[in-house]
Structure formats: C-alpha cells, structure tokens
Swiss-Prot record:
Domain of life: Eukaryota
Record's protein name: Meiotically up-regulated gene 113 protein
Function description: Has a role in meiosis.
One Pfam family, short name: T5orf172
Keywords: Cytoplasm, Meiosis
InterPro entries, per database record: Meiosis_regulatory, Phage_T5_Orf172_DNA-bd
Gene that produces this protein: mug113
GO BP, one annotated term: meiotic cell cycle
Cellular component GO terms held in the UniProt record: cell division site; cell tip; cytoplasm
Major location (coarse): cytoplasm
Coiled coil region boundaries: none
GO MF assignments: catalytic activity
Localisation per UniProt entry: Cytoplasm
Naturally occurring in which organism (per UniProt): Schizosaccharomyces pombe (strain 972 / ATCC 24843) (Fission yeast)
Length: 326
C-alpha cells in the first residue's frame, strides 16, 4: 500500500510529464550535438544550480577586475615615462648598498686636490694630486720665478695634463722645512684658515729703550715688538709720552717708500710671524708699566744676530701675502 503513494509523490514533485521513448532519444541527440560547441562560459541560460551560478559570476568579475587593473597600470606607466621625459627626471633605481669596510675604502682610488696660485695674474688652479711630476717636464712647463724672498723650491705634484703654463706657488713651500712638526701644523692650519675679516696694513717693528739708562739695563740685547698697523702716524701719536720706555720704528714691512700697496692680509701675516717665532724665541711676559699704567705685551728681547733671522721671517710672510693676495 505504501509503494504507490511514494511513486505518486515523486511524479507530482517533478512537475514534468514523462516523455516517450522517441522524444527522449531526440533530446539526447540534440544535446550531444550542441555540447560540442557550447561551453560553461557561453551557456548563460543553462540551469546549473545555485552554487554554480555564483562561481560563474565570480570568475567573470575576476576577469574584469584583472583587465581593468592591467589597463590602468599600463596607462600609469606611460604617464610616468612622459612626465619623466618632459621634466627631465631620472627614473628611480633601487640598488643594493653594501657596507664599506676599511679594505674597500683603501682600495678605492681617491681624488686629492690642491690649490695653487698664479704669480702673474693671481688666478687660482685646482690640481689633482695623483703622482709626482717629472722634473724635466716641470721645468719645461713652468717658467722660473726669480724673486728675492720666494722659496727656492716648487714641489708641485699634479697630473701632467693639468699643469698650467704659468708660474705657480704651493702654499706648503712657504713653510720652513727645519721647523718642528707641531709648528708646521700650526702654520698649515693658519694658511688654510679663511678669515671672515682682514684688512690691509703694515707689519711694523718697534724698538723700545728705557729712558733712564738703556745700555745698563739691556746690555747688548734689544727690546722689539712686532705688530700690524693700519695708520703708522696715529700709532705713534697714541703712544703715551710718560712711559718708562721710549718707542721708535725699527723697520716697516713692506717699505712705504718702495711700494704703494700695503700688506693685504695684515692680521694673517702677523699671526704667521708670531707662530713661527714661537719656535725658537721666547716672548716676554706681559707686564704693566708703572709710569704710564698701560699693558706691554708681545715683546721680544733679542740680540743683533737674531734680528737678521727675524727679518727674514717677516720678509717671507709679507712676500707670501703679496704673491697670493695681490
């Protein structure tokens, strides 16, 4: 009794009439002929179930999104290239930066330069210091410079293609090679120092004598002071008349009677002279004069033999200022 009811319920739920054998065979032949040309993508009207329809839609969306992203990326790349060409930008390249060690730094070639000065027109040259120049090549390209207080040697070190055809002077050649290393370093730092303020002036050497009895107090030695002045007459007028020491001008560098141009960097020349004289001379301790009440400093007590050496030092640095800063 239960079997007919079950069969009857199944037949009702299908809602389709049972086809005959001939029509069913015709449908099978038609489906087999169309399945060769139709695929899952172009059978939009085929009823494949709820889950299969969502998968189809998701695949279509993925294809559309991928095509849109690919098109936009191509357009962005073309726009970046056009903008780089129009603005002359360099494209950003990412390179791997390796940390440098001491061996790699020492193995890499370094470019060392030096600045030299032309004696004729005052032009500056930046030369690459790579290897020593052949003396024959040096003498053939640089004319000899004959001046009284110019250093006798020109230790120019440069590449052969960068040597100028005129006379040049290296700053280290002005330093006395017999000085100590400490004094050489002090002079080199002073030569390389770019002063924010300096003015033309003269290097004046004053001689001091005690008014009461100079020969008894000093004997064969003499008290001198080396300082820069811009107006010599004003310095002589401002010296106190009631001082226990009388002051007179021993010599002026450069000589105003022979040249109309003073020393262009008088403060620098004064410091250079004082630093070099500190090597072999001792300065007197500053003291306050009992008569005039002024402070006397930067005084040297020398003899006649030491004066020739001091004069040569002053002449050399005054000549340096004339050659370099003329």
């Amino acid at each position: 009794m239960k079997m007919p009811n079950t069969l009857h319920s199944v037949s009702i739920s299908t809602d389709f009439p049972s086809p005959n054998v001939e029509s069913e065979a015709a449908d099978v032949n038609e489906y087999s002929s169309t399945s060769k040309f139709e695929t899952l993508g172009n059978q939009s009207s085929t009823n494949l179930g709820f889950s299969n329809s969502l998968q189809d839609k998701w695949d279509c969306w993925k294809r559309d999104l991928w095509s849109i992203w690919w098109s936009l990326s191509r357009k962005a790349t073309r726009f970046y290239r056009w903008l780089s060409r129009s603005l002359k930008w360099r494209p950003v390249t990412y390179e791997t930066v390796y940390p440098q060690t001491y061996e790699t730094q020492m193995s890499e070639p370094r470019e060392v330069t030096t600045i030299v000065k032309d004696l004729n027109n005052g032009d500056s040259f930046v030369l690459n210091v790579t290897e020593p120049v052949d003396p024959e090549f040096l003498r053939a390209n640089i004319p000899p410079v004959h001046r009284k207080h110019l250093p006798p040697r020109l230790s120019l070190v440069a590449s052969p293609g960068t040597i100028p055809t005129r006379g040049v002077v290296v700053l280290e050649d002005w330093i006395n090679p017999l000085l100590s290393e400490r004094c050489k370093l002090l002079l080199q730092s002073e030569l390389c120092n770019q002063d924010s303020y300096d003015c033309p002036g003269y290097i004046c050497v004053y001689r001091f004598e005690q008014k009461n009895n100079p020969s008894v107090v000093l004997g064969d030695s003499t008290l001198i002071q080396i300082s820069r002045v811009s107006d010599l007459q004003r310095h002589l007028r401002e010296y106190p008349k009631n001082c226990a020491f009388s002051r007179s001008v021993l010599e002026i560098f450069p000589d105003p009677g022979k040249t109309s141009k003073p020393c262009q960097v008088s403060f620098k020349v004064e410091r250079l002279v004082h630093k070099e004289l500190n090597e072999y001379l001792s300065w007197m301790q500053p003291f306050t004069c009992d008569s005039c009440g002024s402070l006397h400093e930067n005084w040297l007590q020398i003899d006649s033999k030491q004066w020739d050496q001091i004069r040569g030092v002053i002449l050399r640095w005054v000549e340096y200022s004339r050659v370099i800063y003329a």
